[in-house]
Amino acid sequence: MDIVLLIKAAIMGLVEGLTEFLPISSTGHLILAGTLLGFDNEVGKVFDIAIQTGAIFAVILVYWQKIRDTLVALPTEKQAQRFSLNVLIAFVPAVVLGLLFGKAIKAHLFTPVVVASTFIIGGFIILWAERRQEKNPAAVRIHDVESMTPMDALKVGLAQCLAMIPGTSRSGATIIGGMLLGLSRKAATDFSFYLAIPTLIGAGVYSLFKERALLSMADLPTFAVGLVVSFFSAWLCIRWLLRYIASHSFVGFAYYRIVFGVVVLATAWSGAVTWAA
């Protein structure tokens, strides 16, 4: 058993867990971490699915009571039915656009300049969204996910599609998109996490099917370590974020994105890091 490889797997799992649900783009961080650690080969594509699975389990655990109650009430209660429908509606655009354009996006947009640019642009959009909500509190019309309409859900789902561009951040696109549509910071974050469950599961199953030829029992210990570390780090991160947003904005994440994007550009242009995008 290669101990160094297991340590690298743990680091990648930690990066995934800490960045998947924050508005800072797990994809961008995984590309950089994978390059630095030498985890950017073909098997790395399947490994990314494994660590993403850990993150999925984490969000399911955090929201398990709500998920369980919704499933139990689904046959009889309209509120549960509407909530489930909203998640489904928000999920559909990513499926359609992902199937249509996913391959082309991966072929042409996974470059250092694109990743860094979306980091920076996303940071300024977060600053704008936060200042807009601060200056006009009346713009917040939805304070919980149960109050969302199907049209609200569709718009958040369309915002999620922006995350197909590497460096955007799925959680960032859905949370900030939701806030710009009138959701409170808490409601937007909650709905983003609920939407993550079908989105990440769907993307993972599809990617696993495409890359099934790369699967090997020899890689199982590496995948298991990455998955477990991703699960625990994502669980801690989600719980921390839900407490954090109760009294803080996303401004700190915006500045982090901008600085990180500048660093990526600088390292790419200077040749200090050869990105395997």
Swiss-Prot record:
Bacitracin is thought to be involved in the inhibition of peptidoglycan synthesis by sequestering undecaprenyl diphosphate, thereby reducing the pool of lipid carrier available. It is found in: Cell inner membrane. Belongs to the UppP family. It catalyses: di-trans,octa-cis-undecaprenyl diphosphate + H2O = di-trans,octa-cis-undecaprenyl phosphate + phosphate + H(+). The chain crosses the membrane at residues 3-23, 43-63, 85-105, 109-129, 189-209, 218-238, 249-269. Pfam families: BacA. One of its GO terms (cellular component) is plasma membrane. One of its GO terms (molecular function) is undecaprenyl-diphosphatase activity. This is Undecaprenyl-diphosphatase. Its main location: membrane. The keyword Transmembrane helix applies. GO terms for biological process: cell wall organization; peptidoglycan biosynthetic process; regulation of cell shape; response to antibiotic. NCBIfam families: PRK00281.1-2 (NF001389), PRK00281.1-4 (NF001390), undec_PP_bacA (TIGR00753). It is a multi-pass membrane protein. Its EC number is 3.6.1.27.
